[in-house]
Amino acid sequence: MRNTATGKTMNPFTPNPELDLVLVRESAIPPELVYQAYTTPELLEQWFCPRPYKAIEWEIELTPGGAFNSVIVSPEGQRFPGAGCILQAVENKTLIFTNAVTAGFRPAINEGEDAFSFTAIIQLEPSGTGSRYTATVMHADAASKQKHETMGFFDGWNAAFDQLIEVMTV
């Protein structure tokens, strides 16, 4: 993207270390398969949450304003519905989704002690025979970032990505 006023190239995904969490992974899985794992409900159910949690009942519409909804189920059977919105989907390259708004860009109500809004930017690039996966998760304030990190962002997202690799390698 180029700034028309200055002519300089802009990167709209520059992380802010005070607000954002960034996970970078290299894998033997090509970008096409990682993208497929992120956009196919039957595959998401197999890897999206660190076991023994599950993510079920996926509704995904790969268009700006489309739904990115699921239900997280705890080992005890407690259900946590999650409604989100696709902001951008560029096949095999980028998936951006948020829980700050729901399908149709309707403002979301994120209630509860552990609730916070975030926007996730998933970027995929070819790397060797596989891919480089970069997940940038942006938060509105430092407290939300800290809450997400404290609840296990790095362990959870790493475990989930390991599960993605397992599912897509079979």
Where on the chain are the PLM-derived regions?
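Beta-strand/loop substructures that line and gate deep hydrophobic ligand-binding cavities in soluble
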Residues: 106-155
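Hydrophobic pocket/interface hotspot
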Residues: 34-35, 44, 68, 86, ...
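Short beta-edge strand/loop motif at the mouth of beta-sheet-based domains
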Residues: 22-23, 42-81, 92
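Hydrophobic ligand-binding cavity/cleft-lining segments
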Residues: 1-55
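Intrinsic-disorder/low-complexity, polar/charged segments enriched in Ser/Thr/Lys/Arg/Asp/Glu/Gln
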Residues: 18-24, 31, 67, 81, ...
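Hydrophobic/aromatic beta-strand elements that line small-molecule binding cavities or substrate pockets
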Residues: 25, 57-60, 82-88, 117-126
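A short, structured loop/turn motif at beta-sheet edges
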Residues: 31-32, 61-63, 87-95, 123-132
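Short beta-strand segments that buttress and anchor functional surface loops
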Residues: 68-74, 98-100, 109-110
